[in-house]
């Protein structure tokens, strides 16, 4: 039995943080940001009473409506996030409560920007095994909650947002999720993209707050090089394993980290730029949210048709990375 994506949805907060807004906060300007990242604006969940679970709940309700399902039909909810409402309980459990999915079990998955692909793979295995028939997968992050807005290196990159899919048995074995390749590298990744404060190694204290250890840190140059290589390599591997040429691919859907990274991947793969999905200019890097947000936008604009070959690729902290081949049903 194959598993397929049967519905998509996304949620972007209404408030916009533009490059011009950042000019008032940082030593930067619109041209500098656009030339290095391709980002012009990003969405921010400003309401202090709303957290990641709120965005997930908005996505979950849309998914149910699109498939005309009751919340009680859902058997499993997986939320990929690095910005949970709190360390525990899992944000997925909060989502289960928000939508009334009383028959579902729920858990969070942390693989940073690769989180959605990791979570999607997990859902696929539950469906392929016959254990479940209706699994909800959501990637969401309120990155503004862990960004130091005095740090130009990170403040310009990230935004808030969520996207999700329903995974169900495919209508037939010719469509659905046809291949998955996932990887990790803790040796090279552990010190280059991280947030050190707040865990069991450095519990929250006056010292961790004073040292800004509760904000994200990244070695931008090293992460850039690693991301381009990893995503291009895994996309090529997926294509070779499935005898796909660049002409066969309807859309390459990469993690939306930086337009320069996206362009470099496309160039290395030889894929027509018209087939490379990009919305980073409008939303920035929403971490686990980027790929499902892209899928939902393609779907909403009627750009996905039966039999389309999609290659999804991502790279994130860990390092973690991977690719998934979907033939749209």
Swiss-Prot record:
GO terms for biological process: fatty acid biosynthetic process; secondary metabolite biosynthetic process. Coiled coil: none annotated. GO terms for cellular component: cytoplasm. Residues 256-260 are annotated as: ACP-binding. Its main location: cytoplasm. It comes from the Bacteria. It catalyses: malonyl-[ACP] + acetyl-CoA + H(+) = 3-oxobutanoyl-[ACP] + CO2 + CoA. GO terms for molecular function: 3-oxoacyl-[acyl-carrier-protein] synthase activity; beta-ketoacyl-acyl-carrier-protein synthase III activity. Its EC number is 2.3.1.180. InterPro entries: ACP_syn_III_C, ACP_syn_III_N, FabH, Thiolase-like. Keywords: Acyltransferase, Cytoplasm, Fatty acid biosynthesis, Fatty acid metabolism, Lipid biosynthesis, Lipid metabolism, Multifunctional enzyme, Transferase. Homodimer. Catalyzes the condensation reaction of fatty acid synthesis by the addition to an acyl acceptor of two carbons from malonyl-ACP. Catalyzes the first condensation reaction which initiates fatty acid synthesis and may therefore play a role in governing the total rate of fatty acid production. Possesses both acetoacetyl-ACP synthase and acetyl transacylase activities. Its substrate specificity determines the biosynthesis of branched-chain and/or straight-chain of fatty acids. Belongs to the thiolase-like superfamily. FabH family. This is Beta-ketoacyl-[acyl-carrier-protein] synthase III.
């Amino acid at each position: 039995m194959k598993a397929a994506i049967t519905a998509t949805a996304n949620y972007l907060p209404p408030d916009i943080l533009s490059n011009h807004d950042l000019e008032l906060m940082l030593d930067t300007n619109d041209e500098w940001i656009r030339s290095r990242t391709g980002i012009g604006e990003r969405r921010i969940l400003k309401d202090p009473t709303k957290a990641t679970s709120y965005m997930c709940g908005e996505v979950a309700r849309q998914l149910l409506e699109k498939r005309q399902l009751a919340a009680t039909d859902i058997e499993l909810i997986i939320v990929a996030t690095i910005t949970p409402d709190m360390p525990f309980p899992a944000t997925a459990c909060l989502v289960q409560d928000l939508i009334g999915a009383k028959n579902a079990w729920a858990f969070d998955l942390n693989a940073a920007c690769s989180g959605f692909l990791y979570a999607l793979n997990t859902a696929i295995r539950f469906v392929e095994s016959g254990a479940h028939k209706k699994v909800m997968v959501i990637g969401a992050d309120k990155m503004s909650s862990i960004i130091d807005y005095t740090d130009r290196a990170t403040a310009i990159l990230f935004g808030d947002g969520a996207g999700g899919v329903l995974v169900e048995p495919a209508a037939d074995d010719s469509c659905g999720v046809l291949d998955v390749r996932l990887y990790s590298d803790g040796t090279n990744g552990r010190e280059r993209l991280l947030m050190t404060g707040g865990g069991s190694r450095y519990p929250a204290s006056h010292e961790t707050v004073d040292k800004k250890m509760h904000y994200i840190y990244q070695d931008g140059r090293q992460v850039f090089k690693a991301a381009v290589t990893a995503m291009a390599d895994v996309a090529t591997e997926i294509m070779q394993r499935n005898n796909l040429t660049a002409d066969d691919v309807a859309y390459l859907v990469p993690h939306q980290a930086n337009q320069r990274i996206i362009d470099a991947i496309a160039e290395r793969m030889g894929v027509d730029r018209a087939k490379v999905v990009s919305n980073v200019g409008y939303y920035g890097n929403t971490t686990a949210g980027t790929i499902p947000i892209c899928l939902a936008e393609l779907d909403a604009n009627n750009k996905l048709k039966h039999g389309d070959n999609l290659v999804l690729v991502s790279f994130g902290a860990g390092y973690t990375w991977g690719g998934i081949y979907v033939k749209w049903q």
